[in-house]
């Protein structure tokens, strides 16, 4: 039987992230064969993952990253079961590493099939489920491109956002972060009026009609009044029309124009735990 040293255990722990006792047990069972020990730990992860597949994974880390020239950004959520795990330094580090890798892919399916230190992202999640003892999954994957893309991560990694702009300009870094912070705080449903789907608009009109009828407004006037109330709905719920959180005297669109008269927000992405 092979002699298992502390250095061997530490090496396996570095490779897999598993606990000391789990690593020692795996090495003993594999008679010092590292590849077999790693495989056994992954099989353990598969068993744990199968047993926890129906668990809720609403905690974790929401991470937004951009590439070196700020033209592409990705926001992901790496979800787990408890806040205790979600705030763990190694868990957050893994989420950031995965987010940076995600910049190279266009969708979640491609990303999950990609290589992460010798195994796929999907298999890494299963492996770490066995290590941590909680269900892990990539819940959100959103990509955004633009002439300039900025990011913001809210305290505690609970919300992460990206914003895209039509051009680069002096002060764009701060503006991009401020608008991304706006998207995190105010949770708009769309960039502008054109981005709000027809079903949502129809629903809001019906809500307004019901309120007007309750107020006793004449039926002949209700349709036009209800449509008129959409302006307030768009102002509250679309990013560029919202009051800017740092100066409510102007809209987000006007704040952006104060940076550069020709600058506009072209898109945003928002991911939140829960």
From Swiss-Prot:
Please verify whether the record's keywords include Cytoplasm: yes
Localization, UniProt: Cytoplasm
* Residues annotated as transmembrane: none
**According to its record, what are the GO cellular component terms?**
cytoplasm
Q: What is its main location?
A: cytoplasm
Cross-referenced Gene3D superfamilies: 1.10.286.20, DNA helicase RuvA subunit, C-terminal domain (1.10.8.10), Elongation factor Ts, dimerisation domain (3.30.479.20)
Region annotated Involved in Mg(2+) ion dislocation from EF-Tu sits at 82-85
**Matching PROSITE patterns, A to Z?**
EF_TS_1
Q: Which UniProt keywords apply?
A: Cytoplasm, Elongation factor, Protein biosynthesis
Record InterPro entries: EF-Ts_dimer_sf (IPR036402), Transl_elong_EFTs/EF1B (IPR001816), Transl_elong_EFTs/EF1B_dimer (IPR014039), Transl_elong_Ts_CS (IPR018101), UBA-like_sf (IPR009060)
In UniProt terms, what function does this protein have? Associates with the EF-Tu.GDP complex and induces the exchange of GDP to GTP. It remains bound to the aminoacyl-tRNA.EF-Tu.GTP complex up to the GTP hydrolysis stage on the ribosome.
Which family is this sequence assigned to? Belongs to the EF-Ts family.
The identity of this protein, by name, is Elongation factor Ts
